[in-house]
């Protein structure tokens, strides 16, 4: 039993030397990833009531499933595009600015989904919310990796991935609390991640590596 306790303590000892700034970077990216996962979990829960209203009439389960599948695909296409584009954009405007922009896009378009009047409108908002989600992940992971020493990166990135599971848990609890007020209010909650923007703008700065890349780009 002592050996087991010592091993566990040794595994956790690596976090003791982290600075406040490193924890800040980790928390912001982890929180962003958690809220992204919350959105995807909530979307599956509100899909039926949302499409029942937006399709009009008396849509069948097959109708809802077909349109819901299209909307989910559209969101994932946006996710892919956001990851591709922001992987490039971040090299030019910086990872911190790119992270702030990705969270802004995600928050605005997730909130706008609550104002949808048709499946097409919902799909458009869903696509751009997906762009923000994909961008946040592709920018956030390198930002965390660059904030920590190489010896700790694998561990801290592994811990960061717990945000996905936490987001699913949060999504279920949020729906249990406010789902009864209507599906639109669930989407309005997507504006909450915008709070992180204030933290990013005031507290976070670009890694030294970005400054080096910018300097080499000017010199070339």
What are these regions (language model features)?
Residues 1-220:
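Transmembrane-helix signature of 12-pass secondary carriers
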């Amino acid at each position: 039993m002592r050996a087991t306790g010592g091993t566990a303590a040794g595994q956790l000892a690596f976090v003791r030397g982290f600075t406040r700034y490193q924890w800040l970077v980790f928390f912001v990216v982890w929180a962003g990833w958690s809220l992204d996962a919350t959105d995807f979990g909530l979307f599956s829960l509100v899909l039926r009531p949302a499409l029942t209203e937006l399709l009009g009439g008396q849509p069948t389960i097959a109708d809802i499933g077909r349109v819901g599948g299209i909307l989910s695909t559209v969101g994932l296409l946006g996710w892919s595009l956001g990851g591709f584009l922001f992987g490039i954009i971040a090299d030019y405007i910086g990872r911190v600015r790119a992270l702030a922009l990705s969270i802004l896009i995600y928050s605005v378009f997730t909130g706008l989904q609550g104002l949808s009047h048709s499946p097409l409108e919902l799909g458009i908002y869903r696509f751009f919310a997906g762009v923000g989600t994909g961008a946040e992940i592709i920018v956030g992971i390198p930002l965390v990796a660059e904030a920590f020493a190489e010896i700790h990166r694998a561990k801290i990135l592994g811990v960061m991935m717990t945000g996905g599971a936490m987001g699913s848990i949060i999504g279920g609890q949020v729906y249990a609390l406010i789902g009864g007020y209507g599906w639109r209010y669930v989407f309005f909650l997507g504006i909450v991640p915008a709070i992180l923007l204030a933290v990013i703008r005031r507290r976070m700065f670009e890694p030294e590596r970005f400054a080096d890349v910018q300097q080499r780009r000017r010199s070339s």
